[in-house]
């Protein structure tokens, strides 16, 4: 099984992406609770290309620092097209570098809200610069909308498939 951390700034769509992956690939989605009311971690296990993948994220940014230990097989970095890379994005990249976790793909989320192609391209360049500063190169970028894909919009669902393809190709 490949353990894939879904990382990025808070509210950039990590949990929505996991829910969408679970729906499209008929995964087994679970919520693991910190206590009786607080979700600690959301995860889904899917089968793809003969392999099993466990995608997970933590509800609080501190969950990554407290629970990741470098045994993860990879990470997907989620960045909102409307916000670009923010402090949580930078921290996720730093944490991956510190723990030796390879970022297998970058998912540019919420693309349905940005009409200007140039703005998305500029934001992608900012993300690429951030990755390059940490020695991370040749990482595929996939544009999409976890929300619309989760609602069954086929053009957006296909982009989730491209994301899973990119992760699988890494291995």
Residue locations for each model-derived region?
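Conserved helix-loop functional segments at active or binding sites
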Residues: 23, 27, 84, 169
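Conserved Switch II/interswitch segment of TRAFAC-class P-loop GTPases
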Residues: 51, 58-62, 70-121
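A generic secondary-structure signal
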Residues: 67, 95, 129-130
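Canonical P-loop GTPase G-domain recognition
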Residues: 102, 112-171
């Amino acid at each position: 099984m490949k353990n894939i951390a879904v990382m990025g700034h808070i509210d950039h769509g990590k949990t929505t992406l996991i829910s969408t992956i679970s729906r499209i690939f008929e995964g087994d989605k679970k919520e693991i609770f910190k206590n009786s009311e607080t979700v600690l971690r959301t995860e889904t296990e899917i089968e793809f290309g003969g392999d099993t993948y466990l995608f997970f994220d933590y509800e609080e940014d501190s969950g990554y620092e407290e629970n990741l230990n470098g045994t993860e097989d990879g990470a997907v970095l989620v960045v909102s097209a409307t916000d670009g890379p923010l402090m949580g994005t930078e921290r996720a990249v730093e944490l991956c570098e510190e723990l030796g976790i390879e970022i297998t793909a970058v998912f540019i989320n919420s693309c349905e809200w940005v009409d200007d192609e140039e703005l998305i391209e500029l934001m992608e360049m900012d993300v690429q610069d951030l990755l390059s500063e940490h020695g991370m190169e040749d990482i595929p970028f996939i544009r999409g909308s976890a929300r619309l894909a989760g609602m069954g919009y086929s053009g957006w669902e296909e982009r989730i498939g491209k994301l899973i393809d990119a992760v699988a190709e890494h291995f």
